[in-house]
């Protein structure tokens, strides 16, 4: 299988029999038009309504490939970003779908929408969407509990409670499986100290064949690479993405 980094949290996976595209936002290197030239079935996933994970441009691809299957989180419909008939499959946490070629399970998120488990060609793939321990930077030695103000998000949060929600989602996912061939997971230095904590907790919970960082822009590549010291300690391969359009075989 070939995994290609498109941008931010957007990826394409090409197998011997199909193409999977996750959380498309932008395509600086023009990856998608080349993929749409194939005769393989194409499946497009969007994990939630945030603009950095969902772009209505995906529906314009039907002009090139009328047979694309769109698999979207139900929260996108709830936020009126699309009409129901525009997507083929709508899933919320706990929902599943299969067509014989791929099997999809929508797992939870402690933010918006869902995360995805996709099984195809003997591989189990995980895309986290916005599942992450987003407020880990507040869990310092001097934190005494309760609410703290997050200037980035403009809200008061309880980081201890948020971490429990995140770990609860991991527990629910583990009820389905304890291992993945490849995992795409947020490692976003913009959220401050502790930005690797969620990914570290994930690899402590699951067997991972390859960990792939996401949820950053060009300025965040090197900060994402810091996660490699933690994957190396557990003998987990880590992909140090260096630019949009990078690919790796796994």
Region spans (language model):
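Structured loop/turn residues at beta-strand edges in well-structured enzyme cores
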Residues: 39, 102, 178, 206
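Binuclear metal-ion centers of metallo-dependent hydrolases, dominated by the metallo-beta-lactamase
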Residues: 1-8, 81-97, 191, 195-250
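A short, compositionally biased micro-patch
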Residues: 6-8, 16, 109, 119
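Active-site HxH/HxHxD metal-binding segment of metal-dependent hydrolases
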Residues: 33-97
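Metallo-beta-lactamase
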Residues: 70-125, 144, 237-249
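Active-site environment of divalent metal-dependent phosphoester hydrolases
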Residues: 27-30, 49-54, 77-80, 95-97, ...
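Pre-active-site segment of Zn-dependent metallo-hydrolases
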Residues: 10-61, 131-176
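Active-site neighborhood of phospho(di)ester-bond hydrolases with catalytic His/Asp-centered motifs
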Residues: 21-25, 40-54, 70-75, 126-130, ...
